Design a protein with these regions (language model features):
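Helix-turn-helix DNA-binding segment
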Residues: 291-294
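Structured, helix-rich domain cores that form ligand/interaction pockets
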Residues: 1-282, 303-357
């Protein structure tokens, strides 16, 4: 029950029909803190075996009736990646990167959490060092790791190593998790049949509040699911393009010599997002029929790696690579560039070269 170990044990109790009471134990694990008292590094699939060993030992010390690690079901998981801007050669500060992220394509069904009280405005406002978006089934959280450590663990000896780190995190609650893995449970080494019920029957009972099918731990923590969760949710907000100043972004679009309607649509979105200081803000001003045109342009800009969010001129930075794509490219040492990707990269390089002349 020592939180400093990276594991907490919470007793749960709920009254159901006919005065029956269901009791259980909720275990909250911070993998890196559990393994090596590290509050910065993100856990990976290879850490699972060590986590299982420590959990089973701690559970056995508390009670022999506690389930083994593989017999438990996941209720929530927080896939994340740490991106060190300096290490990847990304030429902006963490504060600047968070500002760009806040201008991203925030879906209307996500609500931004207001975490700080502003004395001047006399109201709660969003944290300047993070973007915290939530729905009933998930949370997407982007934050500067160094600033967050200053709030939670200001005296942590390794805090300095997080000075240039941006963490991208997706917190998946039970319903989102089950929807992701319901058809691949059998791939788990822990999977067992659930009272003979078919998957679809279990899903219906879950929605009716009668049944919670087991979510195997190893399936969700596998790279297959982990990276799918991160890429799908993070790219939705960041988009897939690099950041440029408005003039350079416009020049890249024009360098393709698209038909006039397509080029006009893409540049129109670049200018609208720049003027509104964000994709979501620009989209909020549009009528329903205009949103269709706007979304089409977003996808077209993705294909040429131009982000709709542009770099403020006062920063004196011409190009900032896409955060998530740069991270995955660096991890894949044998990454093979497709002909189309090479074509897109050459367009960007040519325009930037002309800007330097």
């Amino acid at each position: 029950i020592n939180e400093d170990k990276g594991i907490r044990w919470l007793l749960l109790s709920r009254k159901v029909k006919n005065n029956y009471v269901i009791r259980g134990v909720l275990v909250v694990i911070n993998p890196e803190s559990l393994i090596e008292n590290n509050y910065i590094r993100a856990a990976e699939e290879d850490d699972l075996k060590k986590i299982e060993e420590i959990y089973n030992r701690e559970a056995g010390n508390i009670s022999k009736v506690f389930l083994k690690f593989g017999e438990c079901s996941l209720n929530r998981v927080d896939p994340c990646v740490n991106i060190d801007l300096k290490e990847l050669g990304i030429p902006c500060t963490p504060e600047q990167m968070i500002k760009l992220i806040k201008r991203g394509n925030i879906p209307r069904y996500y609500k931004e959490r207001k975490e700080c009280y502003d004395e001047k405005q006399r109201r709660m406002v969003a944290d300047k060092n993070s973007l915290y978006l939530e729905t009933k089934s998930s949370v997407i959280n982007f934050y500067w790791k160094y600033a967050k450590q200053g709030e939670k663990h200001p005296n942590y000896s390794k805090r300095e190593s997080s000075r240039n780190v941006i963490r991208l995190e997706v917190q998946c609650k039970y319903l989102k998790l089950y929807a992701l893995i319901k058809n691949i449970n059998e791939e788990s080494k822990y999977d067992e049949s659930d009272e003979g019920l078919l998957r679809d029957e279990m899903y219906l009972k879950m929605y009716e509040g009668m049944y919670n099918p087991v979510i195997p731990i190893d399936i969700v923590l596998s790279a297959k699911i982990y990276e799918t969760i991160i890429c799908k949710n993070i790219y939705k907000i960041l988009r897939q393009g690099d950041y440029f100043t408005l003039d350079i972004a416009r020049n890249i679009v024009e360098s393709y010599c698209f038909r006039s309607g397509k080029e006009e649509r893409m540049i129109e979105v670049l200018e609208s997002v720049n003027e509104s200081h964000g994709i979501a803000k620009a989209k909020s001003k549009l009528r329903k029929d205009e949103i269709v045109r706007f979304n089409k342009a977003l996808k077209e800009l993705d294909t040429i790696w131009v982000n709709p969010v542009t770099i403020p001129r006062r920063w004196n930075i011409k190009h900032i690579p896409n955060l998530l794509r740069t991270y995955y490219d660096a991890r894949c040492e044998e990454y093979l560039v497709t002909k189309y990707e090479e074509y897109v990269m050459n367009h960007i390089a040519e325009v930037l070269k002309r800007e330097r002349q």
